[in-house]
Amino acid sequence: MATCIWLRSCGARRLGSTFPGCRLRPRAGGLVPASGPAPGPAQLRCYAGGLAGLSAALLRTDSFVGGRWLPAAATFPVQDPASGAALGMVADCGVREARAAVRAAYEAFCRWREVSAKERSSLLRKWYNLMIQNKDDLARIITAESGKPLKEAHGEILYSAFFLEWFSEEARRVYGDIIYTPAKDRRALVLKQPIGVAAVITPWNFPSAMITRKVGAALAAGCTVVVKPAEDTPFSALALAELASQAGIPSGVYNVIPCSRKNAKEVGEAICTDPLVSKISFTGSTTTGKILLHHAANSVKRVSMELGGLAPFIVFDSANVDQAVAGAMASKFRNTGQTCVCSNQFLVQRGIHDAFVKAFAEAMKKNLRVGNGFEEGTTQGPLINEKAVEKVEKQVNDAVSKGATVVTGGKRHQLGKNFFEPTLLCNVTQDMLCTHEETFGPLAPVIKFDTEEEAIAIANAADVGLAGYFYSQDPAQIWRVAEQLEVGMVGVNEGLISSVECPFGGVKQSGLGREGSKYGIDEYLELKYVCYGGL
């Protein structure tokens, strides 16, 4: 049986033994063989080789501040959402550690801003290369801590690395302007300068990509960062810190302060209100985003917010049913429905409704397989925790009580408390929770509509507007709907729209600013106007 050689050699005594493939458990004074099988359903107890052989250097449990690995006064557990088993104990940073990280980032900023764009570009490229070299290990870390199917985790690592590659190139494309003024003896210059220390707060659903999308832009611009990763998935952020160090990113430029859910509020407030922080970048819920905006307002900090969504997926009568179903599958069930751009409500025109629902249900039954993310063939892993399952369950029960029909799924999965069956509902009406509350799970509610105007009205009724999708073969309709949807991103006959080259962000209460693309670096730059006279 495979054993955890990486755990035996890494010296990280706080690591738990229940990573898939692991047969050792830590105790005071050393590591001893496991006394028995890990708890949970038999199918989830152990996946030999899941993390066995993982690079020891990548599995870190301390905070990373000023180029050093530092413990905290306390630790908190990180669990495998598939089995509920403890993966390890991680440094539980508090306000003191947060302030120390900000100070380290500020001191580093005074030096990093003077590094040439070419050198910053080179270092980011080295970081990218190391991610590619370690992509298999990084993917396994994601699957272990988030439950995401391994195939999707590999996809995230590539997506994550590509942000470093992209911004390594954008670092050398930060241009200013020369403006000719009415006065003959003057010239006006516009300089773009790094804004300063950025506080970066990231979610659990994309624990690697949401970091590099922000940090790549910040470092390319000449800023330094303090990253507070989600408490459910800190290992990915810490692995990135190790690779950043190996790439030669200077001490203090990239700092990571993991913390428990108990400390998250005060740590978030500490880094967002610190006078040495000039920029806040957050991906998460709209509710938390509003709290951070309040913190930022007191000192008028620059903010980027990528918040909640309620993405509509509209299928018009002219749509190709097979294409629409393929798009619906991709949009809804990636990461088990736990993405901010997942379709949240399906609006299907009356003439195509029955054919779409039938084909959608058949595709779900044929192509979706619930299981542990390390198991080959799994397409739907666990939800991140039982609270997430309870939310999906509540929405399903609410809809059914108000007249919705369960086409397929509809209940918890037998694999364990964090699993829920991929669910399709029809006869859904707008008074149901699932139509105005972001689900973040494998639930697809279908609303029947009659006219284009009706569909647009339903889609735009939300107070958020991140992404929207629609399928149509009518060119005139395509232009009308694309322009009328009140969202930041539109997929036309396409269910997957994210790309490093394209601007990511929303309107209304879905956020502020854009990430990725040529516009992403601007979020970390200040414009300075210089008037040069006496010429």
UniProtKB/Swiss-Prot annotation:
One of its GO terms (cellular component) is mitochondrion. The modification N6-acetyllysine is found at residues 126, 265, 365, 411. The keyword Repressor does not apply. Keywords: Acetylation, Disulfide bond, Mitochondrion, NAD, Oxidoreductase, Phosphoprotein, Transit peptide. The record marks 205 as: Transition state stabilizer. Its EC number is 1.2.1.24. It is an enzyme of class 1 (oxidoreductase). NAD(+) binds at residues 213, 228-231, 284-289. The keyword Disulfide bond applies. Residues 1-47 form a transit peptide. SUPFAM superfamilies: ALDH-like (SSF53720). InterPro entries: Ald_DH/histidinol_DH, Ald_DH_C, Ald_DH_CS_CYS, Ald_DH_CS_GLU, Ald_DH_N, Aldehyde_DH_dom, Aldehyde_DH_Superfamily, Succ_semiAld_DH. Its main location: mitochondrion. The modification N6-succinyllysine is found at residues 126, 135, 184, 265, 402. Substrate binds at residues 213, 334, 498. Catalyzes one step in the degradation of the inhibitory neurotransmitter gamma-aminobutyric acid (GABA). Belongs to the aldehyde dehydrogenase family. Homotetramer. NCBIfam families: SSADH (TIGR01780). This is Succinate-semialdehyde dehydrogenase, mitochondrial. It comes from Gorilla gorilla gorilla (Western lowland gorilla). The gene is ALDH5A1.
